[in-house]
Amino acid sequence: MTLFYEELVDLSPLITELEAQGIEKDAHDDLILIVRSTMHHTVMDALFANLEQDHIDHLIALLASNEEQALPFVREKISDADGLISKNIGETLDLFLADLRE
């Protein structure tokens, strides 16, 4: 499944580290799933932390009435907060990599 913020998330350093650790495929896949889930929450937390209340209200209204218009709205807001989101993603990946190396 491709996520709407996929271009912001580069998992290649993590995948390289998992391969270097010799982690078996099932555990590897489970860890990637955990990282993807964490990244999703990281992106959404950064997004909502940067939305003003009227934008949050607008997004909720879009989700309730016209979900197709919600995605472009969220993409626009992510673009506006790209620096913070990228920073948060980088920090999250660094934490995962540090844990793997221990």
Annotated model-derived regions:
Residues 1-102:
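Intrinsically disordered, low-complexity linear regions
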